[in-house]
Amino acid sequence: EILSIGQVSTKYYLRLIVKDKPGVMASITGILGNHQVSIGSMIQKRTLTVNEDKMAEIVIVTHQVLEQDMRDALAVVKGLSCLGSIENVIRVEEE
């Protein structure tokens, strides 16, 4: 049986640029959790200044998640005022 892409389950590597202020991580992780996206690891890589705003680079690696759940979560994350950009969304293949 061939699955639709929304039914495929995989891990994801996400790289986001967000405002470097309290509550941003809670907003993002709350959205992911509400869409059944479990976080395997998360790290703040660096801070930078964009148009005089202090920004942070966040890298998240998820546990296995359905493609559709990830798409739905990212659609909500895109609406956050604290989001600068979603730099990467990469499927991670298991070994």
Give the ranges of each region predicted by the language model.
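A conserved regulatory-domain signal marking ACT and ACT-like small-molecule sensing domains
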Residues: 1-95
